[in-house]
Design a protein with these regions (language model features):
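Hydrophobic ligand-binding cavity/cleft-lining segments
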Residues: 1-48
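Short, highly charged C-terminal tails/helix-capping segments
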Residues: 4, 133-140
Length: 140
């Protein structure tokens, strides 16, 4: 039996997930994350609102994708392709109520290498850092 390295799936390439519990209720987190200011924090500037299943987007930095599914106050699943990348990755934003607030989770799969996995881990951690600052400074 061959064991795969952490993060390597059988058929979806490499994957990574990053989460943090923020001191905010799920509804308020959802409203902020899908607002123009919130979308700019995690997806990029220029994303059309409101997000709806099936729409395509292109951010001001050239990242493109399509909203695959959207379950209000729960999750958004989308394709994500930054400039220079040859294929889409899949990104999920998942919210879950906790005793101390809202767990915000970003999950990426269809990554091409362990190096890309680590880069995405750093990217999503940075996003969560910025969201934490925005929420704690009452920008929501």
């Amino acid at each position: 039996m061959t064991t795969r390295p952490t993060g390597l799936t059988k058929d979806a390439g490499w994957q990574v997930g990053v989460s943090r519990t923020l001191p905010i209720e799920v509804g308020a987190a959802w409203d902020y994350l899908l607002s123009p200011a919130g979308l700019a924090h995690w997806l990029g500037d220029g994303v059309p609102t409101p997000l709806e299943k099936g729409i395509t987007y292109k951010t001001t930095d050239g990242t493109t994708g399509q909203i695959r599914s959207l379950h209000p106050r729960d999750r958004v699943r989308l394709t994500w392709r930054p400039p220079g990348r040859r294929q889409d990755t899949i990104v999920q934003l998942v919210l879950q109520s906790t005793a101390t607030g809202c767990s915000v989770r970003f999950h990426s799969d269809r990554l091409t290498s362990q190096r890309e996995r680590e880069a995405m881990r750093a990217h999503w951690r940075n996003v969560l850092d910025r969201l934490t600052v925005a929420i704690s400074s009452d920008d929501t």
